[in-house]
């Protein structure tokens, strides 16, 4: 499993085939490699997948990346991070229907890798809201996965989303994390469950880029050897 971030295959908001090819050669030098690859294309082009004016162009860009990878690494299974999109407060019929419009992309990907990061602690919102958030987002992915015969691998994280001003980047308590994972694994739509999860890990990156985050400062204050440090 590997992730390609937007800087590894996109230039100025457009697919950069030279850059994508370099990334493939760097991460998967053997052309017959078997692996899972998640493309993380966040930003305007991603947002435009749900716009009226730029939908076709964005869809074309997203699909062309998959076609290129399939041509050059035919044994790699590829999908997009955040497809279908995530919703916490407005997981309604409008959100569901908008995601169903991405049928051309669902037909192309090998799997769905919807993001189910945790935003709030149970002390900030009622635990049932966190449970419903997980259930509704996984159910939508499973519904789409069943329709297009695609496995679902929700992307999870052991930290709260950085948008949370009080708890952002703090480790999710172990028992809460177990509940989080179990809720994902137990969600079912017409007999279909997730095929697994993709566990995002970027502690080294955030340690370098979020040096002023109060929660990371507290966590790392007594760490002497980061190479041996393990999330507990």
Tell what function each PLM region has:
Residues 1-86, 169-178:
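Substrate-binding cleft of extracellular glycoside hydrolase catalytic domains
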């Amino acid at each position: 499993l590997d992730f390609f971030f937007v800087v590894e295959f996109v230039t100025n908001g457009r697919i950069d085939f030279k850059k994508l090819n370099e990334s493939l050669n760097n991460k998967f030098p053997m052309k017959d490699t078997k692996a899972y690859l998640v493309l993380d294309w966040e930003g305007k082009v991603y947002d435009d997948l749900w716009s009226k004016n730029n939908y076709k162009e964005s869809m074309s860009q997203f699909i062309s990346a998959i076609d290129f990878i399939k041509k050059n690494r035919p044994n790699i299974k590829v999908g997009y991070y955040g497809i279908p999109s995530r919703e916490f407060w407005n997981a309604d019929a409008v959100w569901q229907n908008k995601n169903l419009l991405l049928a051309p992309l669902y037909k192309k990907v090998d799997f769905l890798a919807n993001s189910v990061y945790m935003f709030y602690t149970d002390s900030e919102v009622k635990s049932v809201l966190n449970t419903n958030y997980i259930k509704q987002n996984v159910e939508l992915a499973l519904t789409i996965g069943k329709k297009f015969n695609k496995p679902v691998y929700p992307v999870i994280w052991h930290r709260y989303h950085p948008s949370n001003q009080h708890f952002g980047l703090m480790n999710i308590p172990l028992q809460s994390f177990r509940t989080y994972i179990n809720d994902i694994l137990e969600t079912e739509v017409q007999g279909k469950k997730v095929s697994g999860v993709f566990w995002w890990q970027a502690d080294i990156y955030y340690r370098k880029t979020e040096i002023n985050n109060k929660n990371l400062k507290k966590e790392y204050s007594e760490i002497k050897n980061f190479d041996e440090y393990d999330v507990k």
